Amino acid sequence: MTYLQEASRNAVTVPKLQAMRDAGEKIAMLTCYDASFAALLDRAGVDVLLIGDSLGNVLQGQTTTLPVSLADIAYHTASVARARPAALIVADLPFGTYGTPEDAFRSSVELMRAGAQMVKLEGGEWLADTVRFLVERSIPVCAHVGLTPQSVHAFGGFKVQGKTEAGATQLLRDSLAVQAAGAQLIVMEAIPTLLASDATKQLRIPTIGIGAGLDCSGQVLVLHDMLGIFPGKRPRFVKDFMQGQPSILAAVEAYVAAVKDGSFPGPEHTF
């Protein structure tokens, strides 16, 4: 059995994401961990596939993303890449793998060799030198600000960020700093809608929201969440797109359409 498919659309590249942002076309992003789903998500028109350290939660049963290793991410990145999707492949740098610019470079090289076309790392202003170090060495970078799950213990739990004036000011500083360092994409997680809107207006690069409101350049969800596969209470920023759909493909197509036409997220999914 093969998961390869003939390309039905042009490849989504880093410059393509910038062009989409500049043209006002929303970017649809989902997590992905294997070849089968990579082919399906690509067929549904997803623009970006994220091999997220969320695999620690949804695949490994961990309560946080902290136990996920670089080898874990590399393995799943290679699995996704074998499907040869037109979608851009972005891979997370796990906790503890980018403490210095040199560490980040070594880790990123492993993920790029596995098939990643961009790496994502959590943090803002303090990571500017690392972002610059990677970009200067031809590694595209996606930054992640707001609620950064690898900082769960520092935050005291999974809490909305940027609610205070000081917090909002720092988030804007973080976003502008990583952009100045060369980041080409930025994920904003669990921050007030107005703050995400303000940041998106101030930034030149695309912003991808998850619990950050409608005004971001695009949206991302964990694949399992948007298919209704989550134990316990549904996170506020999640919509179950599987409801009322005849197939997983149809559910993913509905997600892509909702992101593109601006009907997702709704007010009930934001802070």
Swiss-Prot record:
InterPro entries: Pantoate_hydroxy_MeTrfase, Pyrv/PenolPyrv_kinase-like_dom, Pyrv_kinase-like_dom_sf. It holds the Pfam family Pantoate_transf. It comes from the Bacteria. The keyword Cytoplasm applies. Its main location: cytoplasm. It is an enzyme of class 2 (transferase). GO terms for cellular component: cytoplasm. Mg(2+) binds at residues 53, 92, 122. Binds 1 Mg(2+) ion per subunit. One of its GO terms (biological process) is pantothenate biosynthetic process. It is found in: Cytoplasm. The keyword Magnesium applies. One of its GO terms (molecular function) is 3-methyl-2-oxobutanoate hydroxymethyltransferase activity. Pathway: Cofactor biosynthesis; (R)-pantothenate biosynthesis; (R)-pantoate from 3-methyl-2-oxobutanoate: step 1/2. Keywords: Cytoplasm, Magnesium, Metal-binding, Pantothenate biosynthesis, Transferase. Its EC number is 2.1.2.11. Its cofactor is Mg(2+). 3-methyl-2-oxobutanoate binds at residues 53-54, 92, 120. The active site is at 189 (proton acceptor). It catalyses: 3-methyl-2-oxobutanoate + (6R)-5,10-methylene-5,6,7,8-tetrahydrofolate + H2O = 2-dehydropantoate + (6S)-5,6,7,8-tetrahydrofolate. Homodecamer; pentamer of dimers. Catalyzes the reversible reaction in which hydroxymethyl group from 5,10-methylenetetrahydrofolate is transferred onto alpha-ketoisovalerate to form ketopantoate. Belongs to the PanB family. NCBIfam families: panB (TIGR00222), PRK00311.1 (NF001452). This is 3-methyl-2-oxobutanoate hydroxymethyltransferase. It comes from Paraburkholderia xenovorans (strain LB400). The lineage of its organism: Bacteria, Pseudomonadati, Pseudomonadota, Betaproteobacteria, Burkholderiales. The gene is panB.
